[in-house]
Design a protein with these regions (language model features):
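A generic, well-ordered mixed alpha/beta core segment in the N-terminal half of proteins
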Residues: 99, 103, 108-148
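Alpha-helix boundary/capping segments in eukaryotic regulatory proteins
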Residues: 92-93, 110
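Histidine-centered, transition-metal-coordinating active-site segments
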Residues: 1-79, 83-89, 96-97, 130-347
Length: 347
């Protein structure tokens, strides 16, 4: 008996009837022989962890540029926090932890350098538009492994595509945005829980806001600390979802109200704060200038990207290249292309 089969039987005996069982996966983009040790979602998680795109997340901005301090979140630490929150919720609800972890670790692989500044400018100047969730799916489907992709399961791919979007609904009930699995719903709400709390934590550290600026009723409801905020939201998701099992992942109207109020506060006082917005505009220009330059100088683009030829339309290849950059790589490339180097006088 294969170890994978033993683990799949364990899932059948221990997971909720609402959980996505590995044995019942909808399959992969391309058929392949499955691992005899790891169930499919665990295999997907491992592929994501070992991908180059995952490693690059450590040098991509969450909200505050990493050079400002060692304790600010990066896109990688955000991803790990989402995975931890999602696994806590999944374990309590007897859902598939391997699946929530795989989706969590892959959900931001397509994020641009400089956080949402990079996403906004690429969406504005690329004719087909740009969304980081769609780019994350493109990373795992096409760009990794030199163009062959990671060949992930449909459930992980769906969860990556349908994770939270900006000021969208906290919990999606119906419609095209609702994920295929409960596990993907868990990741969606865990993503929101993570950034609602840690972006406030980082904003206080960066002196963009003070603890006294947080609305009093939000402090009373969530608690005064980072850990209390997370605990309140996680407990709210778990207990409401247990109560309304048939409906999917749920939160109370009261929790939804305060989560949205906290999110509105973040947008108004942090993301759009003068200090943050000033950096945003500078990063916007870096991405815009690189895109425009490469569009006009295709030979230079191929040289910098290490390509012999375009593998897709020119604009698409340029977007893939820029979206995959880390903050520091984008800085260095901008400096290399646009800033004059000092004269070197031989002695």
């Amino acid at each position: 008996v294969k170890i994978r089969q033993i683990l799949e039987e364990k899932e059948e005996n221990t997971l909720s009837r609402y959980a996505q069982k590995s044995r019942l996966t909808r399959g992969r983009l391309r058929e392949e022989e499955e691992c005899d040790i790891r169930p499919c979602f665990q295999h997907d998680r491992d592929r994501i962890i070992h991908s180059k795109a995952f490693r690059r997340l450590k040098h991509k901005t969450q909200v505050f540029l990493a050079p400002q301090g060692d304790h600010y979140r990066t896109r990688l630490t955000h991803t790990l926090e989402v995975a931890q929150i999602a696994r806590t919720i999944a374990k309590a609800l007897a859902l598939n932890e391997d699946l929530v972890e795989a989706i969590s670790l892959g959900h931001d692989l397509g994020h641009t350098p400089f956080g949402h500044a990079g996403e906004e400018v690429l969406n504005a100047i690329y004719p087909s538009g740009f969304r980081h969730n769609e780019q994350s799916l493109r990373v795992v489907d096409v760009l990794e492994r030199d163009g062959s992709g990671l060949n992930l399961t449909m459930e992980v791919r769906d969860g990556i595509l349908r994770h939270s979007k900006g000021r969208g609904e906290i919990v999606v009930r119906d419609g095209e945005e609702r994920p295929l699995t409960r596990e993907a719903e868990v990741v969606r709400v865990s993503d929101i829980i993570a950034y609602l709390s840690h972006d406030i934590d980082d904003a206080i550290r960066g002196q963009v806001i003070s603890p006294k600026d947080i609305p009093d009723d939000c402090v009373r409801f969530f608690g005064p600390t980072h850990s209390k905020r997370i605990d309140t939201m996680v407990r709210g998701v778990i207990f409401e979802s247990l109560r309304d099992g048939e409906l999917g992942i749920s939160i109370s109207e009261e929790l939804e109200y305060y989560m949205k109020k906290l999110r509105d506060f973040l947008y108004e006082r942090v993301y759009e704060a003068p200090l943050v917005h000033d950096v945003f505009l500078k990063c916007y220009k870096i991405i815009e200038d690189l895109y425009t330059y490469f569009l006009k100088n295709p030979a230079r683009f191929l040289e910098e990207a290490g390509l012999e030829d375009f593998y897709d339309e020119r604009e698409r290849c340029i977007v893939d290249f820029i979206a995959g950059m880390t903050d520091r790589y984008a800085f260095k490339l901008y400096e290399k292309i646009f800033l004059p180097l000092p004269w070197r006088i031989p002695f």
